[in-house]
C-alpha cells in the first residue's frame, strides 16, 4: 500500500490511482482532504505519520475523491454537492455542510474553506493561510484534464470561481491540486480564466476523445485541457458567430 508522503510541515499527500488526497495535522486533530478512488485504508496509512483523531472533508463528490468515505462515520462537504453525492453516486453517510469562509480548526492550525464552483457546483479548496497555499480540488491543474462534461459541470461558473480565487490570490503563492502536477504556482489562474473564456467564445478548436467510454470534446489551452460535452463545440461556434 502506498503511504502518505510529506508535502510540507505537518501536511502529507497520498497518490491513489491518478488522484491524490491529503492529510493536514494540527495540535488536536488531523484533517483528511478527500479519500481517493481505490479504498486505501486511510486510518492505517495516517497512523504512520500522526496519532491524532481524523476528520474528513471532501473537495467535491466525484467518486475519485470519495472512494474511502465509508471508513468515516461523518464527513464535511459543501451543500451544493450533497445531491450529487447521494443521488448520482449513491453514497451514504452523515454529511455536515461547510460553506465559503468556514474555518476548520485543527488546534493551533486553521484551514479556510474557499468555494470554487464550476467543475462541480460545490467544489471547494482549503486555504492554509500560515503556509500561503491552497490544498486539494480539481479546478486548477497544469498539464491535466479538467473535466467539464456532464450535467453538473458549468464552464461559466468555473470562470466565476477562478475569478473569485484571483481576487484572493494575494493570500497564497502555491496550489496543491488533486491531479497532475503536484505543485502549481498561483500565477496560472489568469491563464486558466482566459483559456476558459476563449473556449466559451468559440476561439479554441476542439478534438473528439473517448474518456471512460464516453465521447467528449477536448479543448487544449496549452497549460491544460478542458473536456466538455460534444454539444459544447456546436454551442461555442454559435456564440463565436455572435461576436463576428
Set out the residue ranges of the language-model regions.
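Short active-site segment of divalent metal-dependent hydrolases/proteases
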Residues: 63-64, 122, 141, 182
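Active-site HxH/HxHxD metal-binding segment of metal-dependent hydrolases
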Residues: 37-107, 142, 195-205
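Active-site-proximal segments of metal-dependent phosphoesterases and phosphodiesterases across multiple
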Residues: 139-152, 186-189
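Active-site neighborhood of phospho(di)ester-bond hydrolases with catalytic His/Asp-centered motifs
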Residues: 32-35, 53-64, 76-81, 116-118, ...
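Metallo-beta-lactamase
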Residues: 6-8, 70-121, 128-131, 143, ...
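Short, function-defining helix-loop hinge/capping sites that tune catalysis or transport
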Residues: 23, 42, 68, 72-73, ...
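Conserved beta-strand hairpin/beta-sheet module of binuclear metal-dependent hydrolase folds
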Residues: 1-48, 126-142
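Accessory terminal helices/loops
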Residues: 163-244
